[in-house]
Amino acid sequence: MIRVTVWNEGVHEAESREVAAVYPEGIHGQLKSFLGAQEDMEVRTATLREPDCGLPPEVLENTDVLIWWGHKAHDEVPDELVERVHDRVLRGMGFIALHSAHFSKPFKRLMGTSCALHWR
């Protein structure tokens, strides 16, 4: 069984009726719905506004793959969480960055660059 955690800021759904209409359960909920239909996946979700951004140590320890959807609240992710995600990836957890997550704090920490589109 692959243990997947889908993380989403949850900001767009909260701020935009149009986005909320398309993703009534949030973007993370839509991804969970699709991935959860796979027989070999156990899927949970986490969002920025939850305690520990939904990713306390016990959740990360029980995650095989972390899917990270980010767009505009990158700076709101606490540095302590970034370090926990970084450590967990170094110990084997997969990390999939979606949408603008190339600019998320965990992805930048993992890549060791600014990850700006013009960084080179």
Located regions from the model:
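An acidic, glycine-rich "communication" segment
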Residues: 102-120
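Short alpha-beta junction capping motif
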Residues: 60-105
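Short, glycine/charged-enriched secondary-structure capping and boundary segments
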Residues: 19-22, 58-60, 80-84, 110-113
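Aromatic-Pro/Gly-enriched surface loop or interdomain linker
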Residues: 1-62
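Active-site alpha/beta core segments
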Residues: 50-52, 59-60, 89, 109, ...
